[in-house]
């Protein structure tokens, strides 16, 4: 089967969050038995240099604000084809210092127009799998009435809060037909279109990244026209739980760890916890923390409203009052949050038990996973979440809000701790206190939580099998 994965992120090349990880992991799992090609836009200032074999390179035309030229360069990478599309005559759109900017609907619609032109020139494509609203226009462009044939289109919602509202005139720049454009337009305001809305109507099947989040989406009334769109397609909509790549996230082989360990040590809990402790010592030395403070809780997250930054701040107070260590590693995406957390970071530089790191440093993050006893994920909503899956893989017990994919993967008393209420901090503090108390006073119970998490299948094989089932059902 020829499968194309279209996205604006793919680890390890271009990544801002979990989207890039999922696109890479799913593609790699599918490529074992199928011909998988990943389409990415070229970001001149961001794309890393790499020496993979070039399979093909050619120039082609696409329509967006007139006739434009693009170059498709295809590489062989880990059994897959990675095709990077450079918008030669509109290169300034992607010459940015960050993946996402204020002009994303324009930039990514131009990429979608180029991707559609590229796909239409290929000999045979069975499935085009589009990831999130960024490539929503691609669904409509691949369903144009004048096309002699078109592949089956799968669209995955990674975060329903981001939808791609834009001007209808902007989408018209792709020369999409009036019929196609109508799928994107809002009835209440035809001058406004929504990339997500059009993708819902123009795709053969729609998925999201966990079963619980699928229900959250069906119960979301924040925009009644988007709600009508998803309800009209609910018979071809489901949640498929994300997974992680066990080869990438593996404490037995991770070079960033001071000491490696794995599930084979579950037969010798004392040895396992000694190795976790050695990683903790290495991290404490690196960050200047005092070894007197234990357990170690971490937060590894984008610091945005969705992720519960107010709970992250509350955790700092709880750690101070209860004498355990806390490391927060994350990136802020707005100036006010950046200001607040920078002030906190500066005020805690001499703290013996708390550190805030406002940067994503992959080796450091991996060491944190290996050193931490617990990982806190206080999200207001969470489509799936990958950090809890990685944490469990590294023997780090998840403390989560029971929502979306977190509810699907973390069960209180089985492999972690949960809280529900977000109107105050009482439920959250109760969860933290329960986790710290269990660690300190009930080592046998704590080991059972760690064991359950480390033995949990990553879900990557299952995820790929579910998607293959969807693909096959459409062919």
Curated annotation (Swiss-Prot):
It catalyses: [(1->4)-alpha-D-glucosyl](n) + ADP-alpha-D-glucose = [(1->4)-alpha-D-glucosyl](n+1) + ADP + H(+). Disulfide bonds: none annotated. It holds the Pfam family Glycos_transf_1. SUPFAM superfamilies: UDP-Glycosyltransferase/glycogen phosphorylase (SSF53756). Pathway: Glycan biosynthesis; glycogen biosynthesis. Keywords: Glycogen biosynthesis, Glycosyltransferase, Transferase. Its EC number is 2.4.1.21. It is an enzyme of class 2 (transferase). GO terms for biological process: glycogen biosynthetic process. PANTHER family: GLYCOGEN SYNTHASE 2-RELATED, PTHR46083. NCBIfam families: glgA, PRK00654.2-3. Belongs to the glycosyltransferase 1 family. Bacterial/plant glycogen synthase subfamily. Synthesizes alpha-1,4-glucan chains using ADP-glucose. This is Glycogen synthase. The gene is glgA.
């Amino acid at each position: 089967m020829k499968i194309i994965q279209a996205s604006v992120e793919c680890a390890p090349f271009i990544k801002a969050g979990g989207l890039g990880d999922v696109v890479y992991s799913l593609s790699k799992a599918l490529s074992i038995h199928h011909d998988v090609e990943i389409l990415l836009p070229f970001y001149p200032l961001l794309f890393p240099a790499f020496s993979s074999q070039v399979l093909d390179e050619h120039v082609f035309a696409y329509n967006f604000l007139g006739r434009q030229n693009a170059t498709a360069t295809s590489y062989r990478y880990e059994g897959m084809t990675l095709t990077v599309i450079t918008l030669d005559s509109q290169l300034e759109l992607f010459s940015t210092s960050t993946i996402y900017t204020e002009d994303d609907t324009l930039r990514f619609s131009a990429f979608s127009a180029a991707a559609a032109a590229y796909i239409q020139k290929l000999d045979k494509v069975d499935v085009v799998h589009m990831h999130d609203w960024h490539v929503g226009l691609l669904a409509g462009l691949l369903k144009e009435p004048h096309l002699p044939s078109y592949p089956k289109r799968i669209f995955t919602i990674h975060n329903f809060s981001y939808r791609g509202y834009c001007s209808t005139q902007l989408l018209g720049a792709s020369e999409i037909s009036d019929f196609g454009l109508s799928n994107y337009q809002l009835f209440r305001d035809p001058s406004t279109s929504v990339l997500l809305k059009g993708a819902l109507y123009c795709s053969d099947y729609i998925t999201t990244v966990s079963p619980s989040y699928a229900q959250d989406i069906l119960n979301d009334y924040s925009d009644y026209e988007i709600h009508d769109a998803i309800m009209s397609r609910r018979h071809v909509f489901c949640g498929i739980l994300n997974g992680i790549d066990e080869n990438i996230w593996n404490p037995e082989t991770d070079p960033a760890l001071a000491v490696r360990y794995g599930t084979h040590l579950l037969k010798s809990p004392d040895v396992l916890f000694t190795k976790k402790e050695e990683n903790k010592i290495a991290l404490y030395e690196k960050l200047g923390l005092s070894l007197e403070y234990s357990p170690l809780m971490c937060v590894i997250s984008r610091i945005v409203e969705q992720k519960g930054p107010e709970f992250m701040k509350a955790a700092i107070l709880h750690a101070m009052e209860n004498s355990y260590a806390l490391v927060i590693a994350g990136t802020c995406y707005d100036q006010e949050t950046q200001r607040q957390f920078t002030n906190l970071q500066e005020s805690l530089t001499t703290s013996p038990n708390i550190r805030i790191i406002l940067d994503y440093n992959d080796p450091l993050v991996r060491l944190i996973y290996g050193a931490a006893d617990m990982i806190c994920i206080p999200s207001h909503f969470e489509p799936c979440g990958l950090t809890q899956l990685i944490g469990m893989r590294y023997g780090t017990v998840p403390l989560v809000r029971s929502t979306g994919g977190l509810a699907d993967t973390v069960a209180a008393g089985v492999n972690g701790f949960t809280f529900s209420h977000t109107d105050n901090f009482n439920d959250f503090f109760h969860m933290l206190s329960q986790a710290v108390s269990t660690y300190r006073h009930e080592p046998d119970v704590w080991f059972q939580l760690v064991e359950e998490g480390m033995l949990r299948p990553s879900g990557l094989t299952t995820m790929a099998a579910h998607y293959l089932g969807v693909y096959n059902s459409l062919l």
